[in-house]
Amino acid sequence: MRVINLGRQDYLNIWDKMKTFTNTRDKNTKDELWIVEHNPVFTQGVSSKPEHILSNTDIPIVQTDRGGQVTYHGPGQVIIYCLFDLKRLGMGVKRIIEIIENSIIDLLRTYTIKAHLKSGAPGVYIDNAKIAALGLRIKQSRIYHGLSLNIDMDLSPFIQINPCGYQNLKVTQLCDLTDSRDTLNIIAKKLSQILINYVSRNRH
C-alpha cells in the first residue's frame, strides 16, 4: 500500500483526483492512503440537509458524493483518504468502517486518551465530544474518501453547522487532551501505520 502526503490542498482538487484515481484504477493498481490538510471548507455528504448549515458563512460549501452529513475541514486537522479495492481485500464496507474507527481509537490510546464509538453515530468520541469523522463512497467495490481527525485547529466553524447532522454536538481535538508536542505529520504517519496494520491483518 502506498502512503502519499499531499500537504495543504483545496478540497475540490483532491476530490477530483480521488474520483479520477478510482475510475481509472484496475485490478493491479495498488491501494493508497492520501494524507491531506485542507483549506477551510464545509463538505456535505449525500444524507446532508440544507438546514444543518445554521448560518451564512464565508467558508466554501461543497456538496460531495461521500456518505454521511455535513462536517468541517480546516488547517490543523489530519485527513486520511482511503483508496481501497475492497473485493481484493476480501472485506465489506462495514468491516472497513470498523477498521478505520478502531485505528483512530488505537492511535488515541497511545496518547493515553480513552475514545469510544456511539451507536448509530459514525465517528470517534471522547465522552460526548466528537474528535473524528468518517465518510466513504463505494463504486464497484472500490472506496474513496476517508477520515478526519481534529488535532490542533480552530473549532469555531463547527458552531455554524450541526456536525454530522446532530444538533448541538460538541467537538474536541487532540491538543486539548494531551501535552504531546507531536506534529500533524507525525500523528498522520502513526495513524497511517496503524491503519495499514489493521488492513493487513484482516484481508482475506
Curated annotation (Swiss-Prot):
Recorded source organism is Vesicomyosocius okutanii subsp. Calyptogena okutanii (strain HA)
Source species taxonomy: Bacteria, Pseudomonadati, Pseudomonadota, Gammaproteobacteria, Candidatus Pseudothioglobaceae
Protein's name in the database: Octanoyltransferase
Record: active site:
C164
Q: Where is the BPL/LPL catalytic domain?
A: 27-204
Q: Which residues are tagged with the site Lowers pKa of active site Cys?
A: K130
Its GO CC terms are: cytoplasm
Molecular functions (GO terms):
lipoyl(octanoyl) transferase activity
Q: EC number(s) for this protein? A: 2.3.1.181
UniProt entry keywords in alphabetical sequence: Acyltransferase, Cytoplasm, Transferase
The UniProt entry's GO biological process terms, in alphabetical order, are: protein modification process
Q: In which pathway does it act?
A: Protein modification; protein lipoylation via endogenous pathway; protein N(6)-(lipoyl)lysine from octanoyl-[acyl-carrier-protein]: step 1/2
Q: Which reaction does it catalyse?
A: octanoyl-[ACP] + L-lysyl-[protein] = N(6)-octanoyl-L-lysyl-[protein] + holo-[ACP] + H(+)
